[in-house]
């Protein structure tokens, strides 16, 4: 169904995709589709690396939190060394792979304040990276892990600088709204299907109207939740504040209310009401103030590039 709609790039997350027994059979059945999977990397041994090479249409994005101490503290002792060994196996076989990092108040400097971490990933053979800001969803959320507006402002300058200067593509899903025209979720360019089959606007927006086991993909993408989402996009003229969870929380409240969407797990509604919601309201207000001058500067640069383009063509 996805291919019938023109979708030829599919991302797998978890849990851990590499424990799924029929994983490589899916890759073999769809050689015309490009797959990327978020993985902890610990199961990528020589046999699995050979299977990836044979398939030719899968790129792993390996999750880590920084260097050894930070990664092992969150993911278990010895994980970092297993990841480094997995990267060597992938690199030696010429398999395209990248990394995935969750940026928190505690590890933001370790990841991006200097070139050390990115340079190490380049040396290991990674060519791309996804930067996810910590979002307070799921069980036992810790608001003190969320990056501050000041840290986020630093990332708004630092991530594009890395792209310009390094042979490494780094994307920041929250600060790169300038380049994507705002939020890409809600079926505009992307949507998420969870393990139960609930079709959500985004991997972080845990609300749904339909389940993929009950309706076709085409039907689901035209449901009230996706229509309500898309008619509001972009959620702000400030493209550095594109997210309806942490940047425009009133938008998500309106979408859920209007569409009648249900939470896809207990506790998902905490981003809409209660202490977490109040925290996000304050955080979004502070980020609007901090990001406004950066957004203005980016818009000015964009206009200059457009003028140059028009003169050439």
Predicted stretch roles:
Residues 28-31, 53, 91, 122, ...:
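Alpha-helix boundary recognition
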Residues 15, 40-41, 188, 204:
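Structured loop/turn residues at secondary-structure junctions
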Residues 108, 132-201, 242-251:
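A C-terminal junction/extension of Radical SAM enzymes
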Residues 95, 123-127, 161-169, 267:
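Structural alpha-beta junctions
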Residues 204-313:
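Flexible mid-to-C-terminal extensions adjoining Fe-S/redox cofactors in radical SAM and related proteins
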Residues 2-13, 20-132:
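Radical SAM/AdoMet-radical enzyme domain recognition
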Residues 71-74, 147, 183, 209-212, ...:
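Short clusters of hydrophobic/aromatic residues that line enzyme substrate/ligand-binding pockets
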Residues 77-80, 146-149, 153, 210-215:
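Short, conserved loop/turn and helix-capping segments at secondary-structure boundaries
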């Amino acid at each position: 169904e996805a291919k019938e709609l023109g979708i030829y790039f599919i991302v797998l997350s978890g849990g851990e995709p590499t424990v799924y027994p029929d994983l490589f059979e899916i890759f073999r059945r769809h050689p015309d589709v490009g797959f990327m999977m978020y993985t902890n990397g610990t199961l990528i041994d020589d046999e699995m690396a050979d299977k990836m090479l044979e398939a030719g249409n899968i790129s792993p994005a390996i999750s880590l939190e920084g260097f050894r101490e930070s990664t092992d503290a969150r993911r278990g002792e010895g994980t970092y060394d297993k990841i480094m060994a997995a990267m060597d196996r992938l690199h030696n076989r010429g398999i395209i792979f990248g990394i995935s990092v969750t940026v928190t108040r505690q590890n933001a400097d370790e990841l991006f304040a200097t070139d050390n971490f990115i340079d190490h990933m380049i040396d290991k053979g990674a060519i791309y990276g996804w930067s996810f800001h910590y979002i307070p969803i799921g069980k036992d959320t810790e608001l003190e892990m969320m990056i501050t507006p000041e840290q986020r402002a630093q990332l708004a300058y630092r991530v594009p600088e890395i792209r310009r200067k390094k042979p490494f593509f780094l994307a920041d899903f929250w600060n790169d709204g300038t380049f994507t025209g705002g939020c890409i979720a809600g079926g505009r360019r992307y949507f998420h299907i969870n393990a139960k089959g609930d079709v959500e606007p985004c991997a972080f927006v845990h609300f749904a109207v339909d389940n993929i086991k009950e309706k076709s993909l085409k039907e689901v993408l035209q449901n009230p939740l996706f229509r309500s989402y898309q008619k509001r996009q972009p959620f702000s003229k400030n493209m550095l504040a594109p997210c309806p969870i942490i940047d425009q929380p009133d938008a998500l409240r309106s979408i859920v209310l209007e569409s009648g969407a249900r939470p896809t797990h207990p506790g998902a509604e905490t981003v809409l009401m209660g202490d977490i919601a109040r925290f996000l309201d304050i955080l979004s207000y502070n980020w609007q103030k901090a990001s406004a001058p950066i957004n203005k500067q980016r818009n000015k640069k964009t206009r200059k590039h457009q003028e140059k383009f028009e003169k050439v063509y």
